[in-house]
């Protein structure tokens, strides 16, 4: 898998520490992915690992720092150097599980946006059984206008078709009701634009309960709503699976049932765990950037790198750009009045 693909990996920021990050790098390298890891050589302990090169740096950007000023000031920070490595052509994609804001800023400044894209959006594949569902924006843009939501819809549809293999994906707009007039002003306006937009299969509004049901192949929201919704789903999944486990241990009869259910519950828990997806993709840039979930372990780090490599392998950026052009998402009304 992924022979010939090189990924620049931020060696700082993973909440589980250098050991988990290094083990994740080893796992990804075992799949044939080449890695250039930016971090402290001694702590990472990756010297001599085939396919892994450590580029020493001791500077990094923490979650408490203001992302944009920090990225501009800390030219040698690990995430900034990872983005620069891709921009310079030394790597094909970048991955960071550090500060989300710093990763987005470094990637946007370093990798640049696709022509006509007003704002990049963070997209994540939801663990919906039986079909891939792409959800965006999950945190890049807290405040948006209607035109941004429309462009997110085109970005998501293009990526879903190009990378997830969904032919003509149906796109839904997250709102408080299915009716076209429900929701905030920008959501209502976006609904009207999407209903008339050429080249997109618009499913209308979807409610929060429709997210795990897979009513649409792509679901679009502003970054605030998307981030809260995603974390609510993750927290609910942990609570429910934990409650089932505790109930199964409550008495001998339930314990027998729990043993019978263990394979199914184990599979469900793995499917819902952040380690499985690894991270979110920053759509709308000229190269691949994956923002890893900060709490993931080695498997999550490896899967974030694998996701980045997969996107490179299938030509996700070029295919997404082509589909955007075909749909007119970077021209005309969709770009007009969108602002910065």
Task: List each model region and its residues.
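Short beta-strand segments
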Residues: 10, 38, 55, 96-98, ...
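Glycine-rich phosphate/nucleotide-binding loop
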Residues: 108-135, 215-219, 223-334, 340
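N-terminal phosphate-binding or glycine-rich loops at protein starts, especially the Walker A/P-loop
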Residues: 1-44
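Phosphate/nucleotide-donor binding subsite
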Residues: 50-91
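Short, glycine-rich nucleotide/cofactor-binding loops
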Residues: 7-18, 71, 140-150, 291-298
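Short glycine-rich anion-binding loops that position phosphate/pyrophosphate groups of nucleotides
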Residues: 12, 59-60, 99-102, 109, ...
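Glycine-rich phosphate/diphosphate-binding loop of Rossmann-like nucleotide-binding domains
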Residues: 19, 32, 36-42, 142-208, ...
